[in-house]
Amino acid sequence: MMEINSEATVTLVSVVTLPILLALLTRKSSSKKRRPPGPWNLPLVGGLLHLLRSQPQVALRDLAGKYGPVMFLRTGQVDTVVISSPAAAQEVLRDKDVTFASRPSLLVSEIFCYGNLDIGFAPYGAYWRMLRKLCTVELLSTKMVRQLAPIRDGETLALVRNIEAAAGGKKPFTLATLLISCTNTFTAKAAFGQACGGELQEQFLTALDEALKFSNGFCFGDLFPSLRFIDAMTGLRSRLERLRLQLDTVFDKIVAQCESNPGDSLVNVLLRIKDQGELDFPFSSTHVKAIILDMFTGGTETTSSTTEWLMSELMRNPEVMAKVQAEVRGVFDNKSPQDHEGLLENLSYMKLVIKETLRLNPVLPLLLPHLCRETCEIGGYEIVEGTRVLINSWAMARSPEYWDDAEKFIPERFEDGTADFKGSRFEYLPFGTGRRRCPGDIFAMATLELIVARLLYYFDWSLPDGMQPGDIDMELVVGATARRKNHLQLVASPYKPISMQS
């Protein structure tokens, strides 16, 4: 989330040369009382140069090693505090949760989420609380997850068939391409139901893919709020607005079809709530679109990238692969595919593998930024109202201070059950915690577990000829999620063709 948009970087260099802006950009923060320690800041750009040396989560971890787990960094004009310890994270996300429960307004979310009407970036308040309740009770509940089981079953079996076709002749293929297609199609069918035909669905996903390309960091105006006009001058804002309009055009057609074809899709559920008019706030089709867009941005790439990281870790650790595959096959053998989802609860070791994958490869290395709503203290330091707060979950999850053999892939470390997805241990926050915790973990895990189980059951996996486990690079790139920079190439050999069970 701290990646700096390349266009913003170029613009930044240009602006630095304009002396007329010097006085504006070098204004000092009015409060220095017990401010957290931090690295040096330059006039104009603050501490942005510290983030250009390596991946942001890595650079911030290294800086925290010198300046402490509560660290101040001025990013452009924005005062930012970086949290890198479980104790400080607990203060922010539990003890003073309400104080840090809001979000800053960022250009991309402002435009694509219809003025931050989505649950991810809506400012904290009565509207957001209503939205959160609507999502947890209606859209992302255990009941809704069960209701979507037939779609999950169908799309994950389709994934297996697509892998069988791609792996013909034991040729290496790119697993990520098929995973993304599977998760996109599942989310589209869950969101839109049968009302959204193949062509309309494809138009929506194409437009969404273009939009997500802009989700890889902060825009210039996000770092220099008084200079937001720069984003308009460079044409960035107009490009984002054109993309939103393109997405909106397809979205409106889908919503219209859902309105004329009542069903149980997520859009239909929201439309019924809209028509009932029982909410405390005006609720229109625009709100419906903002919520559904969150489902795609927060769900599809999350599941596909996590699965690819998991397969990467298993290929690097053959003994873990053998153990988890034996468990899955022991449970699934001689069972109908229609029974697979009901048997997932018996795959205890596979669940540990997923947990360990999310420890080493969190979906968001830096949790979505929080906004301090009133001046308070964290770790004995004053955090001023309006400060952005970043939680470096990646750094805590890989710290030898909190984990034995922190860099090794050891699923057994979770056997004691003390770490869960709800934030029971603050050094492990794959979905965040507190009020702004991701509400879709049950929804996401149901799909992720079935995909992983079927990949392990139906195929034996190997690396391309001449490649060894140690040759797999684990370099990441941060966009909407942290995904592999170079997609994994694998060879799949059918263990038991799906046709034998169908």
UniProtKB/Swiss-Prot annotation:
One example GO MF annotation: iron ion binding
GO cellular component: membrane
CDD domains according to UniProt: CYP71-like (cd11072)
Membrane association type: Multi-pass membrane protein
Location (main, coarse): membrane
Transmembrane segments annotated in the record for this chain: 4-26, 106-128
Keyword Transmembrane recorded: yes
Keywords linked to the UniProt accession: Heme, Iron, Membrane, Metal-binding, Monooxygenase, Oxidoreductase, Plant defense, Transmembrane, Transmembrane helix
Subcellular location: Membrane
Catalyses which reaction(s): 9beta-pimara-7,15-diene + 3 reduced [NADPH--hemoprotein reductase] + 3 O2 = 9beta-pimara-7,15-dien-19-oate + 3 oxidized [NADPH--hemoprotein reductase] + 4 H2O + 4 H(+)
Miscellaneous comment: 3-beta-hydroxy-9-beta-pimara-7,15-dien-19,6-beta-olide is a precursor of the phytoalexins momilactones A and B. Phytoalexins are diterpenoid secondary metabolites involved in the defense mechanism of the plant and produced in response to attack (by a pathogen, elicitor or UV irradiation). Momilactone B can also act as an allochemical (an antimicrobial and allelopathic agent), being constitutively produced in the root of the plant and secreted to the rhizosphere where it suppresses the growth of neighboring plants and soil microorganisms.
Full protein name: 9-beta-pimara-7,15-diene oxidase
UniProt organism field: Oryza sativa subsp. japonica
Gene: CYP99A3
